[in-house]
A protein has these predicted regions:
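A structural detector for beta-sheet-dominated domains
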Residues: 26-28, 36-38, 53-57, 66, ...
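Short amphipathic beta-strand/extended segments with alternating polar/hydrophobic composition
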Residues: 34-38, 60-69, 143-145
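Short, solvent-exposed loop/hinge segments that bridge or flank secondary-structure elements
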Residues: 22-49
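Central antiparallel beta-sheet cores of small beta-barrel/beta-sandwich binding domains
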Residues: 44-93, 173
Length: 174
């Protein structure tokens, strides 16, 4: 098989068809890393009614989606599990919290034609064919506490660069 044909085979998205909030993605360069979308209270995140989760060998990270002015692309911003967010009270934050600029990680979403999505994904959208966030790996290595929304029990991890491709449709049973 020549190089171009091999590349085209690699770029073919898996044929998993399900709603965006049930699509499960696997990192092409390390199957131990999976990702997906979950419904989020739209009052907590202006740009999308979906949160993004990343499951690593050690923990699950949660992100809100952000798109500054609609012109700067889509970014992942560390957040908390939207299912637990309702249980979080309005207690004051630690004094040192909020002094650093929020961590924002460029997040690219592609269709099967490799065309980029013009806006952050939302409920009702078809499941993307590819997800890519180049700076997630470096954030897991250099900035893991901020990536875990301030959770100091988080630990440094190594994640290679790669695209996330659909692998399954979550049945919601687990």
């Amino acid at each position: 098989m020549n190089g171009l044909a091999f590349l085209l085979v690699l770029l073919q998205p898996a044929s998993v068809s399900c709603p965006i909030e049930r699509s499960v993605y696997q990192l092409s360069s390390d199957p131990a890393f999976t990702a997906g979308f979950a419904p989020q209270d739209p009052h907590l995140a202006f740009y999308s009614d979906l949160a993004v989760w990343l499951r690593t060998p050690r923990r699950t990270y949660w992100f809100s989606l952000e798109s500054p002015s609609g012109q700067g692309g889509t970014y992942l911003v560390p957040s908390v599990d939207p299912r637990a967010a309702a249980a979080v009270d309005d207690a004051p934050r630690d004094a040192d919290e909020g002094q650093e600029a929020p961590l924002r990680i460029a997040f690219d979403v592609f269709g099967a034609d490799l065309g980029p999505w013009p806006a952050p994904p939302r409920r009702g959208d078809p499941a993307p064919a590819f997800l890519f966030a180049r700076d997630l790996g470096p954030a897991l290595w250099y900035d893991w506490v901020r990536l875990a929304a301030g959770d100091r029990s988080a630990a440094q991890e190594v994640m290679p660069v790669g695209t996330f491709r659909p692998m399954a449709c979550d049945t919601g049973a687990g």
